[in-house]
Amino acid sequence: MNRLYEHTTKRCTSSQIDAPLWAEVAAHAEAHQLGDVLGAAVNCFETWSVRLRKPGLLSRLTGSGDHDTEHRTVVVVAPRYVVVAVEGKRRGVHVRSARLDGVSLSDPSELHRLVRETAASAGRFGRLPPDDFGMSVTALWSGAREAASFYIGVSDDSEGRALLDEFHSAVTRAKST
């Protein structure tokens, strides 16, 4: 298996988010006028991600690799917004949010399958994409001037799939109202 991270995802409530991270999310919501997203949370998930190997040479030379050996991602889905908070020892806490009706989701597993099939048909297996499980979320994130993609990795189990399914449903609901 060619995974970059070991992900462990579990459902949580906004009251189960530890106090320092909860305060960061609440401050972000207030600064960006999102309302009480923690109180209005429809879904809340937490994923612990442990890096399985160090970043590649180029990433280490340029400093673009993940500096934390493990980090936590909390996804809070409210009726109109999604808030994503990532916390790591070296990176600190980073909180971003987006309107659900402006979110585009891509299932990397489909792209992953196509790349693997193309590599197999060409007889090239050396540089295949990682087998991590998750979803790429493209949106106009808080404070940004243009849309950007953010990958949310989750565990490849019932909890991880529930996060992806419920997030997809929330985006669909927001776009249809």
Q: PLM ranges: what are they?
A:
Residues 45-134, 174:
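Phosphoinositide-binding peripheral membrane targeting modules
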Residues 1-76:
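Anionic N-terminal interaction surfaces
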